[in-house]
Regions:
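Sec-dependent signal peptide recognition
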Residues: 1-7
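Zymogen propeptides/activation segments of proteases
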Residues: 15-199, 203-207, 211, 215-219, ...
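Juxtacatalytic substrate-recognition/specificity segment
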Residues: 180-328, 335, 339, 343-349, ...
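Acidic/His/Gly-enriched intrinsically disordered linker/tail segments
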Residues: 324-414, 441-467, 471
């Protein structure tokens, strides 16, 4: 929502449009006494009294995982209003947010949500099909025939060919790479003009086979093997490019996907594990768009492969192995973006930059000014960009994506939440999140051993406090930091080299209120609204002790229980 929609006013001169928020009474307020960089979270509607004068940040939030949608579209997820304010002589600062148009899903985002729903719908059929296969006692001869059939030099594949309809086309493809883990095929109709040679396609097979596939399997677990060939198919086909030809959005296209229906044994199933990829030399994103370039696909295909492979593994571990439901979409996507980061970290290790640029000159970097090496460009920058955009316009987005409507910005914050969680709990937690019957917030709670509301609040505090300017070593608890990444330094660098995409050095930077909005001794009040699973950020300085602050709905005294409303207070240095 537009920041201009906030109503900020002194109650001494309030109009009928300004919120009136009573100071919490001593019997209902939680007394907060914090030293510098201390953090405390209290339930919403409780009210707080800050014992000490000083500078504070407060983060009102809805840590909800409940489905609030009133229909089948992203626009039906409502925002919920809140009021925050109190009595004190204060000077306040308010976090900047950019207006966004309703956080609608793009055609590509809708397609990926559809794929996750196909997995949900096909799960019972896939479980039945897997049981049928397990009941058949294979002979050495039948296994050998399966392996031989899977490695035909030319074979047909059925490919989902519509963003919205259950339509498939059959393509004929040639085998260009047969490896330990991967069989890579190329559609015989793929363009040769502006396209890859078979030698270049085979190099993808080697990269997927030796670099990327082992990472996902080691971290998350094994894929299924319903065709008993011991390998995963990769198919490069222009059918993927053409999925978005009617969307008319150049630059927005399907780079690749995994279709869970392939494992269900239905009429359109290929009855095997397959990753589908777009190809260069063919338009994508709309009928008037340029063909995808070689460099675009070189950057996108590896990251898309390791992302979709996590979905494939998750489907096997949740549905086929444990006969449970598919993972909640927000967490499933967050884990796949974690897979992207893991792929990127492999290439970072090959071309290290011990400190931020300038980096050591190497064949792995086109410029010493790059934060990430060339081979990591498709893996890492998109995640940092998506998270940045979430925080810059956070009121219209949700970490937990009620109803599973996940925008690219929401995927960004899901990745960052898991990045923080793994920093706190250890790398092995990624495997625990996948190899389980649990899903969603309950899965996170079981793995972390804590409530989701506590984790959510402390994650938000970490996004504010990580490498906070002026903090000395050990002054900020590890709980409120990202130990694997220096977020502020990375975003500061991105702001320097890509100002249009990163207009501020950090998305949670704040600006002073205009002079007319400076809070007086009488009171302050702010009215806003946010999605379930979102938060806001305010900062202010109090010159007296025992400042009261309330966080409540505009009508009544308490929020809906399912919103999990809570208020995180952070003491900042003066």
């Amino acid at each position: 929502m537009a920041r201009a929609a906030l109503a900020v006013a002194a109650l001494a001169a309030c109009s009928d449009k300004s919120p009136t928020i009573p100071n919490p009474t001593p019997t209902t307020a939680t007394k907060v006494s914090l030293s510098a960089f201390g953090v405390l979270t209290v339930p919403g509607s409780a009210g707080i009294t800050m014992v000490n004068a000083g500078r504070y940040a407060v983060l009102p939030q809805f840590a909800s995982t409940t489905d609030f949608a009133t229909g089948t579209g992203r626009a039906t997820v409502p925002s919920y209003p809140f009021l925050i304010g109190g009595v004190a002589p204060t000077t306040a600062r308010i976090a900047q947010t950019a207006p966004v148009p309703g956080a609608q899903l793009s055609a590509v985002e809708s397609f990926h949500m559809r794929l996750r729903r196909i997995e949900q719908e096909e799960a019972p059929r896939a479980i039945t099909y897997m049981r049928t296969l397990q009941q058949r006692a294979p002979t050495n001869g039948s296994v050998n025939l399966s392996v031989q059939a899977s490695q035909l030099q030319n074979r047909d594949f059925k490919v989902l060919s519509s963003l919205t309809a259950n339509t498939y086309v059959t393509v004929n493809a040639r085998l260009v790479h047969s490896g330990t883990n991967i069989l890579l095929y190329v559609d015989n109709a793929a363009p040769t003009a502006g396209g890859f040679t078979d030698v270049e396609y085979a190099s993808f097979g080697r990269q997927f086979d030796t670099d990327l596939f082992p990472i996902d399997v080691a971290v998350f677990g094994s894929t299924s093997d319903i065709d008993a060939n011991g390998r995963t198919f990769v198919l490069f086909t222009p059918v993927v490019n053409r999925l978005t030809l009617s969307s008319g959005q150049c630059g927005s296209y399907v780079a690749g996907f995994f279709n869970g229906a392939d494992l269900s044994g239905n009429a359109n199933a290929n009855k095997g594990e397959i990753f589908y990829s777009s190809v260069p030399g063919e338009p994508a994103g709309g009928p008037t768009c340029n063909p995808l370039s070689l460099n675009v696909v070189r950057n996108a295909a590896p990251a898309t492969f390791i992302h979709e492979l996590q979905h494939m593994i998750s489907y096997n571990q949740h549905v086929l192995t444990r006969t449970a439901s598919t993972e909640a979409i927000w967490l499933n996507e967050g884990l796949s973006h974690m897979a992207e980061e893991l792929g990127g970290k492999l290439y970072e290790s090959r071309y290290p930059c011990p400190n931020l640029p300038p980096c050591p000159a190497s064949a792995g970097r086109a410029s010493t000014a790059q934060i990430f090496p060339d081979s990591a460009q498709g893996f890492l920058p998109p995640n940092f960009g998506n998270a940045y955009d979430f925080f810059s316009s956070r009121l219209d987005y949700s970490l937990t994506s009620p109803t599973g409507f996940g925008t690219i910005e929401e995927r960004g914050v899901a990745w960052l939440f898991l990045r923080w969680l793994v920093d706190q709990k250890g790398d092995a937690r990624l495997r625990d999140l996948v190899q389980t019957r649990n899903v969603g917030a309950a899965n996170v709670e079981a793995v972390a051993g804590e409530s989701f509301t506590a984790l959510y609040a402390d994650f938000l505090a970490a996004t504010l406090l990580d490498d906070y300017p002026g903090a000395t070593a050990g002054q900020i608890a590890t709980r409120y930091q990202f130990t694997s990444r220096n977020l502020r330094a990375i975003y500061k660098r991105l702001n320097l080299v890509a100002t249009a995409s990163y207009p501020t050095p950090y998305p949670l930077d704040v600006a002073d209120l205009a002079a007319s909005g400076v809070l007086t001794q009488a009171s302050m009040g702010v009215s806003a609204q946010m999605k379930p699973g979102s938060f806001d950020l305010f900062q202010f300085t109090s010159t007296v002790a025992n400042v009261g602050l309330s966080f409540k709905p505009p009508t009544g005294t308490t929020f809906l229980n399912t919103l999990n409303a809570q208020l995180t207070v952070v003491r900042l240095p003066n």
